[in-house]
A protein has these predicted regions:
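Phosphate/nucleotide-binding beta-alpha loop and adjacent structural elements of enzyme active sites
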Residues: 1-247
Length: 247
């Protein structure tokens, strides 16, 4: 009974955590603290953010939106604009609330979409409890459904599709982004990506690095690879700079 109440009505408790600089993180779902801990406590992205002005952000695999909120709270002097792309139905409430957060003054846009092959209108997405969802099922118990494939024309805030920073954490679908949305990459200055060895390109990190090098990117910093949680394989984090980007 208690577990059911916590699952269905967790958002009614209005849990919030102060971040500094008058920003707050709201925890609307019962597993939100896991994501909050990764971003705000472990600060897994801290060493992978370039020391440059970052105003226009594309947040792919936004989950509960904490990366964009973390970056804004770290840089209160900048008015950051973020497009948060997340296919999960479980994250809808949190991302809608964040997009409406008054202190952000409508600078965060939320798109419920999957980074798949844009030749197809919809992409199948798998939910996984207490971890990020994925385009790839990891067990027979994963719940799946169809989600609209990301359409670049819906990014109304940035018609030129150029970003200072693209953050990409797609649980294996990063290869889809690199292949099918290369125009966004080529017009963006920095890329911070969590890579996964099971991405559909089949060649692990080296294949990703080779393709990015072909596009004109240089890896500036890379973490050690580690065993993935929840499935076989490895993952890691890196920062890359577009050497062809015109300021």
């Amino acid at each position: 009974m208690l577990a059911h109440l916590r699952l269905e009505y967790f958002h009614e408790f209005h849990h919030s955590i102060p971040l500094g600089n008058n920003y707050w993180a709201h925890l609307w779902e019962n597993d939100a603290y896991d994501s909050f801990s990764e971003i705000f406590i472990q600060q897994e992205y801290l060493d992978f953010i370039p020391n440059e002005k970052l105003i226009k952000i594309l947040d792919l695999g936004a989950h509960y939106g904490y990366f964009s909120l973390w970056l804004q709270s770290k840089r209160p002097q900048d008015e950051i604009y973020s497009i948060m792309v997340e296919p999960s139905q479980r994250c809808q409430r949190s991302l809608k609330k964040l997009a409406q957060y008054q202190k952000l003054q409508n600078r965060f846009q939320y798109l419920q979409a999957a980074v798949g092959n844009p030749e197809y209108e919809n992409t199948r997405f798998f939910e996984r409890p207490f971890m990020g969802g994925s385009l790839f099922g990891s067990s027979s118990t994963d719940h799946s459904y169809e989600v609209k494939t990301l359409d670049l024309s819906e990014m109304t805030d940035f018609q030129e599709k150029s970003f200072d920073l693209v953050k990409c954490d797609l649980e294996g679908a990063e290869w889809n982004f690199i292949i099918h949305y290369s125009s966004v990459l080529k017009n963006s200055k920095f890329l911070v990506m969590e890579w996964h060895s099971w991405h559909p390109g089949g060649g692990g990190f080296q294949q990703i690095e080779n393709k990015l090098t072909h596009y004109g990117f240089q890896i500036m910093k890379k973490s050690s690879s580690q065993n993935a949680i929840g499935r076989d394989g490895e993952d890691g984090l890196f920062l890359a700079k577009n050497l062809n980007h015109q300021n």
